[in-house]
């Protein structure tokens, strides 16, 4: 059984002829070359679209341990597309990843991703389906001439940390017991349904 986790490796008591059971691979340099050739072929095939693929949303990692970090997610939610003024059908045609399962839980996250979509749309060069008959929203002929395939990430995620200026702690902040407050908020969320049901039953009995 293969070792799992950061544990001590067991002593291997080999009894069979183990030399001929060793797994070997000698195609690593060739695989590296093949991966590079496939990347280059794909870039030519999808040109002039970006090499990195679709635009992804910025999300926070789950769990209390990691939720201070941001990373690229699967796609944008329908609420974010609506806030940016882009339809779901249009988003799929202009290189935006859509994840219909995602729901926004904070106004800050919704605004950040909506702004990301607006920035992408402002920088986007949209080729017409028919060069002879461009439609509304397509880029101008001058923009099409300078268009080049993007080699790097699409709107790369910048991990910049902004520090607040030092200030005095206010009396109102001193009065808040944050640990107790968070426990209360979690309990209210957990038992909201049961408490509402209990209140309804009590109201019906009093009638």
From Swiss-Prot:
Name of protein: Large ribosomal subunit protein eL13
Keyword flag Protein biosynthesis: no
InterPro entries named among the record's database cross-references: Ribosomal_eL13 (IPR001380), Ribosomal_eL13_CS (IPR018256)
GO CC aspect terms: cytosol; cytosolic large ribosomal subunit
Family affiliation: Belongs to the eukaryotic ribosomal protein eL13 family.
GO MF annotation list: RNA binding; structural constituent of ribosome
Organism per entry: Caenorhabditis elegans
GO BP terms: translation
Gene3D superfamilies: 1.20.5.110
Assembly, per entry: Component of the 60S large ribosomal subunit (LSU).
């Amino acid at each position: 059984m293969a070792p799992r986790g950061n544990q001590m490796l067991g002593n291997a008591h080999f009894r069979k002829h183990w030399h001929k059971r060793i797994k070997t691979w000698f195609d690593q340099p060739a695989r590296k070359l093949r991966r590079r050739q496939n990347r280059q072929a794909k870039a030519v095939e999808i040109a002039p679209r970006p090499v990195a693929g679709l635009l992804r949303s910025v999300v926070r990692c789950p769990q209390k341990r990691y939720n201070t970090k941001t990373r690229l997610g699967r796609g944008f939610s329908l609420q974010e597309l609506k806030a940016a003024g882009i339809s779901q059908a249009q988003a799929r045609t202009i290189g935006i990843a859509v994840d219909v399962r995602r729901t926004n839980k904070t106004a800050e996250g919704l605004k950040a991703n909506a702004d990301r979509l607006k920035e992408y749309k402002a920088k986007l060069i949209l080729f017409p389906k028919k060069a002879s008959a461009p439609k509304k929203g397509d880029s101008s002929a001058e923009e099409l001439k300078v268009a080049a395939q993007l080699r790097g990430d699409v709107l790369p995620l910048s991990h910049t940390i902004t520090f607040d200026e030092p200030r005095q702690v206010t009396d109102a902040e001193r009065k808040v017991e944050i640990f107790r407050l968070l426990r209360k908020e979690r309990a209210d969320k957990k038992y909201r349904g049961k408490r509402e049901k209990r209140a309804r039953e009590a109201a019906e009995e009093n009638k």
